[in-house]
Amino acid sequence: MKNKHFYKISSIYTILFLVLLLLSCNSDNNNDAERFKLGIFEIPAGKGYSKTTVKRIDSLQIEEYIKYTEISTDSGVFKKENKVIDTLYIKWKNNFFYTLKMKSPKTELDKDPIFVQINKITKNSYDFTAKIGFSEFKQKGTVYIIE
């Protein structure tokens, strides 16, 4: 009797797991996620960050963006543009999840991995949620294919 009950519950969990697995990546192009692993991409500017150009080659992701620094002088406050290039290691767990790790971290926060979940794929882009380390901070955005 206990075995029957166990198998019934086990079967329900297995079916539930398979349904969740199938629904976990909301996309019309599920089989075409490989096209995001190599190439040149863009993340548009958002609240708190500037437009970022991303180049993926093998296991590296090279990011270029402008960082603004405020400089105070006697005649006023000025914004200085600095072009920043960061190199990160990228490791794909599957077509919908990858981890980024700074090649040369400059701060303690840079040492934490960035976990990225692809939530939705379209013809020329994907929506993602990124989480830094094991913090509760999450950032959502969209990556567009450039080349």
Model-derived segments and spans:
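Hydrophobic/aromatic beta-strand elements that line small-molecule binding cavities or substrate pockets
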Residues: T52-K55, D86-K91, P113-K120, G141-I145
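Edge beta-strand at a domain terminus
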Residues: K83, G133-E147
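N-terminal glycine/threonine-rich, aromatic-flanked beta-hairpin/loop signature
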Residues: S50-K93, F134
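Bacterial N-terminal signal peptides that target proteins for export
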Residues: K2-T14
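Bacterial signal peptide processing site
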Residues: N26-D28
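An anionic, turn-rich surface loop/hairpin at beta-sheet edges
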Residues: T99-K123
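C-terminal motif of bacterial Sec signal peptides marking the signal peptidase cleavage site
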Residues: L21-S24
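Tryptophan-anchored aromatic micro-motifs
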Residues: D32-K51, K67
